[in-house]
Amino acid sequence: MSWQTYVDEHLMCEIDGQHLTAAAIIGHEGGIWAQSDSFPQVKPEQTAAIMRDFAEPGSLAPTGLFLGDGKYMVIQGEPGAVIRGKKGSGGVTIKKTNMALIVGIYDEPMTPGQCNMVVERLGDYLYDQGF
């Protein structure tokens, strides 16, 4: 299965009648493995800052989490495993696996819990597969 298939069928899938606004799988070094059409252009320094927060939880809190031109307020996640952010009526969930970052961006009416479930379910699966 291609990485794009994981994005299209597992991240952008419908859940309770809702779906993510955008999603991507990004390598730890910043390379985009696959993304939805609507995913923002992420800069290398933004990926580096996200990876730093996984290594040093809390490092993003003072500045916020940036994805492309979007800025998210960092909210409670799981140190070293999941980063969550909020922006207006939407937000982002980022799950770290052995080799990649699974990123899901949502807006209302999708809920944070639905986004978390979609992103973390795929992230857990890929982690268990060694990715």
From Swiss-Prot:
Q: Which InterPro entries match?
A: PFN, PFN_euk, PFN_sf, Profilin_CS
Q: Name one Pfam family in it.
A: Profilin
State the PROSITE patterns in the record.
PROFILIN
- Heme found in the keyword field: no
Q: List the disulfide bonds.
A: none
Keyword Signal listed? The answer is no
- Superkingdom of origin organism: Eukaryota
> Got a GO cellular component term for this one?
cell cortex
Location within or outside the cell: Cytoplasm, Cytoskeleton
Entry-linked CDD domains: PROF
User: Which UniProt key words apply to this protein?
Assistant: Actin-binding, Cytoplasm, Cytoskeleton
Q: Name one GO molecular function term.
A: actin monomer binding
Q: Entry's SUPFAM superfamilies?
A: Profilin (actin-binding protein)
Assembly behavior? Occurs in many kinds of cells as a complex with monomeric actin in a 1:1 ratio.
> What protein family does this chain belong to?
Belongs to the profilin family.
Name the job this protein performs: Binds to actin and affects the structure of the cytoskeleton. At high concentrations, profilin prevents the polymerization of actin, whereas it enhances it at low concentrations. By binding to PIP2, it inhibits the formation of IP3 and DG.
Q: Which PANTHER family match?
A: PROFILIN (PTHR11604), PROFILIN-2 (PTHR11604:SF49)
What name appears for this protein in its UniProt entry?
A: Profilin-3
